């Protein structure tokens, strides 16, 4: 598959890092982390671990997002065409979203 036909892996990685950082801050604020004695002794609490993704995981994530978005647009286009419209609107995406999420 051509690299131009997929999402930029640097962008996806930046989005993942942003989400991981936000979840880390939320966990710290809520103090919901209960470290066991073994974790404290080993220094492996969730607070100490940094989330990361390797290159293959990022490529796979990009391909999955590409497939998801492509399928969403195709399904929404079918609904729009059935209604006699030339453009896809948010309501078309809203109608296909439940089944799309179940399919993925």
Curated annotation (Swiss-Prot):
Gene Ontology process terms (BP): DNA recombination; DNA repair; homologous chromosome pairing at meiosis; kinetochore assembly
- Gene Ontology terms, MF aspect: DNA binding
What is the top-level taxon of the source organism?
Eukaryota
Going by the UniProt record, its keywords in alphabetical order are: DNA damage, DNA recombination, DNA repair, DNA-binding, Nucleus
Spell out the coiled coil positions from the record. Answer: none
GO cellular component, alphabetical, reads: nucleus
* Pfam family, any one: CENP-X
**Family matches, as InterPro entries:** CENP-X
Query: What compartments host this protein?
Result: Nucleus
Q: Which family does it belong to?
A: Belongs to the CENP-X/MHF2 family.
Q: What does this protein do?
A: Acts in the same pathway as FANCM to restrain class II meiotic crossing over (CO), and acts with FANCM during meiosis to repair interstrand cross-links (ICLs).
Q: What is this protein called in UniProt?
A: Protein MHF2 homolog
